[in-house]
Amino acid sequence: QESVKMSRKVLVTGLGATTPIGGDVPTTWANALKGVSGITKIDEPWVEEYSLPVYIAGRLAEPAHESERLTKVEAKRLDPSGQLALIAAREAWEDAGFSGSDAESAEEVDPLRTGVAFGTGIGGVWTLLDAWDTLREKGPRRVLPMTVPMLMPNGNAAAVSMNLKARAAAQTVVSACASSTEAMELG
């Protein structure tokens, strides 16, 4: 069987990140070079309450300038995973040096040829947990109407696509730890 050669080249034009060692790319990169670990002890009471065997985690650092990067409406209508996706996407867009704040206002970008390929392991789990608690404690009429769009794994790609006015596609890969690698192949 012949080996398949990749004929496509990938060009990374901008970087964006929200990681346990930094809320943006410069901080993440500087801390990675210093060997900083993002692993910390989880001190919340629920660790003991549920007798969890794991008490450490790689918690995300506070995104740099978070209040400048999200409006109050965006913060309210997006699950934390969607908030982080949008913050990282905006940083990548800015890092790419495009002339406008989205695909419609940037001269060098065609919105009809601009898409989003997003990888996630689970999507809006915090929204799902909050909705479950609200349903149990207060009843179905108190569950937020935005619950479904906020918890769907493809909600993050949709939020980024709508915000950047990328009209070509909004694709989501959900394949555990390989999600982002597979999303890059789509992009």
Language-model features and meaning:
Residues 121, 176-177:
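Short beta->alpha junction loops/turns
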Residues 183:
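Active-site histidine-anchored catalytic micro-motif
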Residues 1-169:
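Conserved "HGTGT" condensation-loop signature of ketosynthase/thiolase-family condensing enzymes
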Residues 180:
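Short conserved active-site loop signatures built around small residues
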Residues 169-175:
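Short loop-beta-helix segment that forms the pyridoxal 5′-phosphate
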